[in-house]
A protein has these predicted regions:
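Hydrophobic alpha-helical transmembrane segments
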Residues: 19-23, 71-72, 111-116, 152-156, ...
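Structural signal for membrane-spanning alpha-helices in multi-pass inner-membrane proteins
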Residues: 85-90, 125-129, 158, 196, ...
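Membrane-interfacial alpha-helical segments at the cytosolic side of multi-pass membrane proteins
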Residues: 171-182, 244-249
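Juxtamembrane helix-loop-helix connectors linking adjacent transmembrane helices
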Residues: 43-72, 92-162, 180, 250-253
């Protein structure tokens, strides 16, 4: 499957400690929330300007499900937050950005193996949802797609931008710090999966369980290959399949 299943070794300064990783991770998380909130605030201000009697709380609640806003917020936060992650790696003054974030090329057959794994997982997850009678498509995504206005922007945000930031942050920065701490690679897989699941609290219980399981698969791929590219490709493929499923569902609804 891969010729490198051990964590990266460093001859000089190692990644941030576990507490440094957690602390700086929280900083990135806060910046992410602030940037997303700033985009939302701009949309709310626009609504209030058009109608001064607008209930700000209700406007924010409704706009939080707006697909166009989601896409725009994602496209704004992705480059800025990735830039912050890169800055934090440089502040460590030792590990290279490529090594720290797992920017390591891998064999094509290894990539195809992991893409096959995620495709199989997507099929099994959908079969389980069907057998259990769970909703075919989350209401949150249906509502979001109804307000995308420009679908290509939404697709780019979910298939390219969101996976790029999330993998650089979770399976890149956080994973590398955790796997070189006392929790080791196994702890890194668990902790990054948990943190990534918390990021998606807008979904229901089944979806959150699926997201955690996905995080575990992504984390194992990162661990076994010591590369961010397999989880990044799997993440994009899974989102692509989910978007195709959403369009199919709306076409039948």
């Amino acid at each position: 499957m891969t010729s490198d299943t051990n964590k990266t070794t460093y001859s000089g300064k190692t990644p941030w400690s576990i507490w440094g990783t957690v602390g700086w991770g929280l900083v990135v998380g806060i910046v992410f929330i602030v940037l997303q909130g700033a985009v939302l605030a701009g949309f709310v201000a626009r609504e209030v300007a058009k109608n001064p009697d607008t209930d700000i709380y209700m406007a924010a609640k409704e706009l939080g499900k707006n697909g166009f806003l989601m896409a725009l917020a994602t496209l704004v936060t992705t480059p800025l937050c990735i830039g912050l992650v890169v800055l934090l790696v440089r502040l460590r003054k030792g590990p290279t950005i490529a090594r720290y974030l797992g920017l390591k090329t891998i064999a094509l057959r290894t990539m195809l193996f992991w893409l096959g794994i995620i495709t199989l997982f997507a099929l099994l997850a959908e079969l389980l949802a069907h057998l259990a009678g769970w909703p075919f498509m989350p209401d949150f995504m249906v509502a979001a797609y109804a307000t995308v206005y420009f679908p290509p922007l939404f697709w780019i945000a979910l298939i390219v931008a969101a996976p790029l930031f999330e993998e650089v942050f979770f399976r890149g920065f956080l994973f590398e710090g955790f796997q070189h701490s006392r929790v080791g690679p196994g702890g890194a897989v668990f902790l990054t999966s948990l943190a990534w699941t918390i990021l998606h609290v807008q979904y229901g219980g089944y979806e959150l369980g699926t997201i955690f399981a996905l995080g575990v698969i992504f984390g194992i791929a990162r661990w076994k290959t010591q590369s961010i590219f397999p989880p990044l490709a799997m993440h994009s493929l899974f989102n692509l399949l989910a978007m195709a499923q959403l369009v199919f569902y709306l076409g039948r609804a």
